[in-house]
A protein has these predicted regions:
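Hydrophobic loop/turn residues within beta-sheet-rich immunoglobulin-like superfamily modules
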Residues: 17, 28, 67-69, 165-167, ...
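Proline-enriched interdomain boundary motifs that mark the N-terminal boundary
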Residues: 4-13, 102-112
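Extracellular fibronectin type III
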Residues: 84-104, 180-202
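Structural signature of extracellular immunoglobulin-like
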Residues: 24-28, 37-42, 74-84, 122-128, ...
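Conserved aromatic anchor
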Residues: 19-31, 64, 112-134
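N-terminal Sec-dependent signal peptide, specifically the hydrophobic helical h-region
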Residues: 1-11, 34-44, 49
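Short beta-strand segments within Ig-like beta-sandwich modules, predominantly Fibronectin type-III
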Residues: 17, 52-60, 149-157, 188
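Beta-strand-rich modules
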Residues: 57, 61-90, 160-185
C-alpha cells in the first residue's frame, strides 16, 4: 500500500555521459530501519511499465538495461521507496532521449607529430560510434603568445593536419566532437583540455 509516512524519492534524474545512462535519486530518510527502492521504465507511447533490474535495491541509482540503449527512444522512468509492506508514491523523470540529453565528453588525443609547418593529430571519439554516425571534430588552435589569435577548423577524419604554422613555435589546441543527430542538428561534446606542441625546425 502507498504510505503517507514513507516519502517518495527526491532529486530523481537521469545522468547520461557518452550514451552510458543511469537513473539516480537522493536517499529517503527514515527514523530507523532501512529503505529499498524499485525502478521501472516505459518507452514511447506504451503505457506498460517494465522492470529495470532494480527491484528492492538498497542503492540510490540504477543503470539502464541493454534494451534501453537506443539513442532515439523517448524513455520515462519512475522510482519508489519501499520499507516492509509500505511503499511510497512513485517519483517520475521527465521524458529522456539519449540522442539529445546525453553529455558527450571530449575526444581522446592519441598522438601528435610535429613538422616545421604543421601538427599531425590523431584522435579517438569519446564513445563507440554506431553505423551511420556522422562525426566532426572542431579544432581550436592558437600560437602560445601573450595575445593569441584563435583559429578554427572542422575535420571529419580522426587523423588530420593543423597547417600553415610557423616553424619552431609553440602552438596549443583544443578539440570537441560534434555528432549529427536525427533532427539535422549537432550534439556538441565537451572540449578537450588544451595541449601544446612545438613545431619542428626545418
Amino acid at each position: 500500500e502507498t504510505s503517507p509516512y514513507l516519502p517518495a524519492p527526491k532529486n530523481v534524474e537521469v545522468f547520461s555521459y557518452n550514451f552510458q545512462s543511469l537513473l539516480r535519486w537522493s536517499p529517503v530518510p527514515v527514523e530507523n530501519g532501512s529503505v529499498v527502492y524499485t525502478a521501472h521504465y516505459k518507452t514511447g507511447f506504451y503505457d506498460t511499465w517494465s522492470g529495470m533490474g532494480c527491484a528492492q535495491t538498497p542503492q540510490t541509482w540504477c543503470g539502464f538495461p541493454p534494451e534501453l540503449r537506443r539513442r532515439r527512444w523517448t524513455i520515462v522512468l519512475r522510482v519508489r521507496a519501499e520499507r516492509g509492506a509500505l511503499a511510497s508514491a512513485w517519483a517520475h523523470t521527465p521524458p529522456f532521449v539519449a540522442e539529445t540529453n546525453t553529455t558527450l565528453g571530449p575526444p581522446r588525443v592519441n598522438n601528435v607529430n610535429a613538422s616545421p609547418d604543421s601538427l599531425l593529430v590523431s584522435v579517438s571519439p569519446p564513445f563507440t560510434p554506431e553505423p551511420g554516425d556522422i562525426l566532426q571534430y572542431l579544432v581550436s588552435y592558437w600560437e602560445n603568445t601573450t595575445s593569441p589569435t584563435e583559429k578554427k577548423l572542422s575535420e571529419s577524419n580522426t587523423l588530420f593536419h593543423i597547417g600553415n604554422l610557423k616553424e619552431s613555435t609553440l602552438y596549443c589546441f583544443s578539440i570537441q566532437v560534434q555528432l549529427k543527430i536525427y533532427s539535422g542538428h549537432f550534439l556538441e561534446g565537451q572540449p578537450s583540455a588544451p595541449e601544446c606542441h612545438r613545431t619542428a625546425l626545418s
